[in-house]
């Protein structure tokens, strides 16, 4: 396991998530509900805890209030430590004014003092908006064994989707020889997962160089990594095999929730050897009435089910009244589904009230996912 004095994690959690539409109107993307009882950020924080990483800086910016309240002091993930633990790092004001994070590299650069107080040998940089399980200590062992300056976790994606990602072109030793940001004609299908391990000395040097460059967009993928390659630093690709999902769109968020219902899913929430931790909602047990019918679904605590629920994910405190059908759908916390409602292939946002007799399904394209949320 990683020793906290050797490796400090910096978790980027300030993204707006605009492609999630109304779900992120008043909520940071990492705080979006997922999987019946979790938030997206739970997966990265649980990975840190399970990997033995005990010092985590969480960099927030967009609509941070609910995310800050949710994280608290990190006790849900066993990260409430006297030394280290979780520290929330929002942008702050200097004499010259508030300095907003302008890119991923800018966010880390503006929190160099946080890293300096620990003076780690390695810095693990993470994104708080992906769904996956990963042992970061194995990646660190790989980084050390390869004597790398930077290691980047990569995953094979379908060739017809490779142009959507930052693509790493490597040699036979998995050394990265070229980085292409969303190439039209990709040479490789190794996509960056946005997970980096830097030697601390290298990170300091190149973040300072990037900050001095007036033409930089202050982004790791666009600016810092290409600069490292140009200067001959050793960048290594770390191949990851397992479930990984970028839930940046309404459809991909729905797909990831549906993946949990598959018998052969690579993402198992009931794996006691690698638990996914979350904040307990403290709701009473769910109630399934005699009029209810539930098949192949995740029903969280506090739910009252009087209608039919099939192949769906229901969060805490959801009510489905008699005569209603919820099929292939995700219903987020506190939503109330009235009587004789039909909901099919949809996401119902937190606290939404669906009136009696409503029919919610896509009429134009059966491949669409309908989003019902405040602000739509």
Curated annotation (Swiss-Prot):
* Pathway as given in its UniProt record: Glycan biosynthesis; glycogen biosynthesis
Q: What GO biological process terms does the UniProt entry carry, in alphabetical order?
A: glycogen biosynthetic process
> What chemistry does it catalyse, as a reaction equation?
alpha-D-glucose 1-phosphate + ATP + H(+) = ADP-alpha-D-glucose + diphosphate
Q: List the disulfide bonds.
A: none
UniProt KW Phosphoprotein keyword = no
The catalytic activity of this protein is classed by the Enzyme Commission as 2.7.7.27
What InterPro entries does the entry give?
A: ADP-Glc_PPase (IPR011831), ADP_Glu_pyroP_CS (IPR005836), GlgC_bac (IPR023049), GlmU/GlgC-like_hexapep (IPR056818), NTP_transferase_dom (IPR005835), Nucleotide-diphossugar_trans (IPR029044), Trimer_LpxA-like_sf (IPR011004)
Q: Name one GO molecular function term.
A: glucose-1-phosphate adenylyltransferase activity
Oligomeric and partner information: Homotetramer.
What family is this protein classified in? Belongs to the bacterial/plant glucose-1-phosphate adenylyltransferase family.
Q: What does this protein do?
A: Involved in the biosynthesis of ADP-glucose, a building block required for the elongation reactions to produce glycogen. Catalyzes the reaction between ATP and alpha-D-glucose 1-phosphate (G1P) to produce pyrophosphate and ADP-Glc.
What is the protein name for this chain? Answer: Glucose-1-phosphate adenylyltransferase
Q: Which gene encodes it?
A: glgC
């Amino acid at each position: 396991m990683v020793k906290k004095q050797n490796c400090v994690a910096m978790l980027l959690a300030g993204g707006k998530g605009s492609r999630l539409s109304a779900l992120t109107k008043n909520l940071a993307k990492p705080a979006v509900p997922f999987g019946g009882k979790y938030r997206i950020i739970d997966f990265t924080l649980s990975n840190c805890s399970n990997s033995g990483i005990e010092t985590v800086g969480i960099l927030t910016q967009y609509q941070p209030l609910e995310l800050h309240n949710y994280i608290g002091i990190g006790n849900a993930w066993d990260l409430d430590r006297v030394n280290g633990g979780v520290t929330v790092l929002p942008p702050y004001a200097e004499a010259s004014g508030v300095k907003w994070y302008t890119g991923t590299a800018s966010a880390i650069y503006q929190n160099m003092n946080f890293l300096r107080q620990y003076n780690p040998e390695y810095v693990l940089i993470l994104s708080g908006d992906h769904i996956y399980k990963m042992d970061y200590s194995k990646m660190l062992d790989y980084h050390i064994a390869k004597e790398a300056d930077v290691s980047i976790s990569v995953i094979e994606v379908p060739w017809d989707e490779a142009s959507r990602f930052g693509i790493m072109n490597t040699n036979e030793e998995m050394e990265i020889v070229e980085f292409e940001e969303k190439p039209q004609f990709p040479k490789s299908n190794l996509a960056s997962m946005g997970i980096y391990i830097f030697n601390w000395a290298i990170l300091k040097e190149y973040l300072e160089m990037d900050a001095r460059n007036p033409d930089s967009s202050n982004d790791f993928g666009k600016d810092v990594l290409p600069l490292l390659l140009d200067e001959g630093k050793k960048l290594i690709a770390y191949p990851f095999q397992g479930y990984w999902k970028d839930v940046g769109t309404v459809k991909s968020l729905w797909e990831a929730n549906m993946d949990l219902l598959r018998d052969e899913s690579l993402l198992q929430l009931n794996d006691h050897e690698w638990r996914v931790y979350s904040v307990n909602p403290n709701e009473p047990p769910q109630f399934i009435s005699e009029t209810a019918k539930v098949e192949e679904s995740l029903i969280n605590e506090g739910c009252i089910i009087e209608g039919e629920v099939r192949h769906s994910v229901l969060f805490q405190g959801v009510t489905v009244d008699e005569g209603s059908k919820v099929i292939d759908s995700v219903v987020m916390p506190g939503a109330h589904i009235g009587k004789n409602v039909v909901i099919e292939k949809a996401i119902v946002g937190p606290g939404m009230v669906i009136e009696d007799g409503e029919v919610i399904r896509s009429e134009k394209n059966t491949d669409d996912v309908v989003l019902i949320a405040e602000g739509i």
